[in-house]
Amino acid sequence: MILLKLYLTLAAILCQSRGMTSLDLDDLMTTNPEIQNEIINKHNDLRRTVDPPAKNMLKMSWDNIIAESAKRAALRCNYKEHTSIAERTIGGVVCGENHFMSSNPRTWSSSIQSWFDERNSFMFGFGPTIPGVMVGHYTQVVWYKSYKVGCAINLCPAQSLKYFQVCQYCPGGNVAGRKYEPYTIGEPCAACPKDCDNGLCTNPCAYNDDYTSCPDLTKQVGCNHPVTANCKASCQCTTEIQ
């Protein structure tokens, strides 16, 4: 009888525990400020832990306009393709995009951690250590220049993986030419000693260069030359992270 009572007590505790930890779509909606904070804090916590360390890693913040764009992407229920560049260009800035699909709802922290865990198959400056393995979600999560993020979730009942989570990052990462160097190696905040929050830089550049050659161009001909008219970041941001 004692064993039976003990068993029933344990079963009740387990059921309550499962009930408390179960999730539904409403629990993950990113219109909830608590969910927004969870997403931002998770990203920033992970960005602080990159190995090798980053000297120029920007601190991320939530952006509602980007979240609306991510929502439109999630509503498409298209797991296989990112939204077009035109659709994820916000305020003239091309944003990056990560997808996570699951058969059961997962916390945002869990999904973001899954993206970050691609680092286990990634070597800085080299890329995937296993041919064909995915590492682009990781490099986007830790792309130094991406400092605004917005995310959304949608239920896609026609799919076996029916929970579809999307995050968009601005400016986008995985830039050609340095895709496998998502940041500059160095002592945390070495590039922003006066604008640092626990290892993350807080001085993003509000402008963008239209050409990857802009830093060299501005050094050669200066910022008053017509050829550097589209090099606003290199010309306007002398102390900010760009």
UniProtKB/Swiss-Prot annotation:
Signal peptide, first to last residue: 1-19
This protein's record includes keyword Ribonucleoprotein: no
SMART domains on file: SCP
Domain SCP: 41-169
Gene3D superfamilies cross-referenced by the UniProt entry: CAP, Crisp domain
Primary localisation category: secreted
Tissue: Expressed by the venom gland.
Function of the molecule: Blocks ryanodine receptors, and potassium channels.
Protein name: Cysteine-rich venom protein VAR11
